[in-house]
């Protein structure tokens, strides 16, 4: 009996080590469940069986240093199944990944789950050090929230298509699945109009004049997002934030003439964007035409699109809008309408070292996971100030570190309290769960800074080892030559 107890104790210890070992693999976001096993899958000759993403899997094998063969004892097997047991939310993005010395097996309900499993495999490859082998393990994983995204305000400050693609591609490796494209602002209308080309004329832009996206570039970006399992949400802000529209047409959007023009532009937008949602803004404006918003929502819906709107903004009744995006502390989710939390998620307001702590620790809309009424979170860069270089836009907003923080929180769920309660300071107790969790995240994030973000604007440095000693003001009596005591 004593021997049995010792055996069970050792077995439990190794089981625990395998689970805790996931952190050593630098997976980000951390999977919901990860059990490590002994051994490695070595990439050599192997068979591939997959009903989806065949080209992507072939590329994966090549990048790992393997080759495909009709006959091999080693194999990669992708299986679409009806359900994965014990997944509480978002089955469509869930997956189970099993790696043994001879097989890699991915089980998922939909293509998206297969794609996220592949991103986990890429991270296992990168973290493992050796290019052609993967740690044996079983990972069961799913996102706590179905919307995990970022917004670029290109209406104020243009970003090249190449830069947008770079951000989308990089962040999809961390399971970010939504790109919100804020295309129009007071400064400029950045989407080409073939019906009204004067809308894109330099004379009607007050910042970065002449810079806009062609309709072909927009279509290409939609396709690029789809290839990376990212939902693109185009926003045409109305009736506020529309000075560029007024400069061009000499009509307010809420006027009869303005509404006629806007509907023609929406025809063009809906035809260009093969996406399910169109964002129509409706924030920070005085409504002078009570029919404007209901009529525009109905018009977009008749084009086969669902409509997203800011909150606070137009006061919708139940069923009048398909999704709301909360942009200030006054924004409130409503039963029956899915909500996106963007209230304290303004990267342009963030401090490099303080706010990332609050961002990582805070629960999304103070909830542990999403629901029918809580879709998720979108981080935003609002370019209120002109920053002329793309590099500086990304650097000064600390874009990538903050996006990795929200990538983990939106995927894992949970957290502690909310921004306005828990603050931006780490607890003094280094043994506390909050401190330990952030330290673990910081370690994994800095690993990616070193191994994946070389040459990219990534301003964050380690801070969990920094100790602050706050004292009273030094009584120098106004004499600046006095020396501060040791």
How would you label these PLM feature ranges?
Residues 245-323, 327-334:
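Active-site neighborhood of glycoside hydrolase catalytic domains
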Residues 148-152, 179-181, 232-236, 278-280, ...:
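Hydrophobic faces of well-ordered beta-strands that scaffold small-molecule active sites
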Residues 1-8:
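Bacterial N-terminal signal peptides that target proteins for export
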Residues 155, 184-188, 237-241, 283-285, ...:
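Active-site beta-loop-alpha junctions enriched in small/polar residues
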